[in-house]
C-alpha cells in the first residue's frame, strides 16, 4: 500500500517539473499548492463519505489507517536515540547519524552541536509530525488531516529560499506557516503541561520570551518549551552546506547536553502526545453525544 506522503511527494514533483519554469513562478507555485491541497481535501471527503455509507467497518478501518500514516512521532524518537548512542561512540558516527534527520551540513558539528540538532528536531517534529495532524483531525476530520500533510509535504519539498524554489515554493512555505501557527503554540503548552519542571508559569514566561526568536514563526515555540524544561540552550551558528546561518539563541544556559537530557526530551514528547490523544478522545465523545 502506497504511503499517502509518498503519493503526495510524487504529485508535488510532477507539478514542480511541469510548472517551475518560465515566467510567473510565484503564481504558478501558489496555484499548484492550492489545487493540490484542495484536491486532497475534497477527494478524501468524497471517499470517506462513500465508504461510510457502504461499510461502517471499512470507514473505521480507513480512518485508523489514515491517522497511522499521518503521524510521525515514533520513527524520529528512535532516530534521536540512535544519534545520542552514535555520538557517545564517536563524533564521526554521531555526525553521520544526525545527518539523517536534519537538513544541514553535519560534517563539522561538535558533539554538543550534534546533540543540540537532534533535540531541536525532536521538538519541531512533535509539533508538525504529531500535534498538528491531530489538531487538524479534530477540526476537519481525516480529510483535514490529509490536507495538512499535503501542506507539510509541500513545504518540506519546495518551501526553500534557494534559487530553484525561492519563487515557486514561496506560497507553500507561507501556507505551512499558517497551518502550523496554532499547533506550534499548542505543542509548547502541552509540553509544559506534561513536564512542568522548573514551574509551569516560569516555563510559560520562558516560551513567551524565546519562542519568537526563531527564524520560523512557529518552530521556536516547541524548541523554547524543551529548552526551558531542560534548562539548556538551543540555536547559534549553523553551516548550511557552505553558508553560515546564525540562529538566535533560545535559552541562556549553554551547558553540555547528555543522554539523560535525551531521555527527558523523549518523555516530554510521549506525555504531550498522550495529552493530545486524550483531548482527541474527549472531543470525539462530545461530538458524538451532541450530534
Predicted features and spans:
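Active-site His/Glu-centered metal-binding helix of metallohydrolases
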Residues: 150, 154, 158
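Hydrophobic alpha-helical transmembrane segments
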Residues: 1-146, 159-291
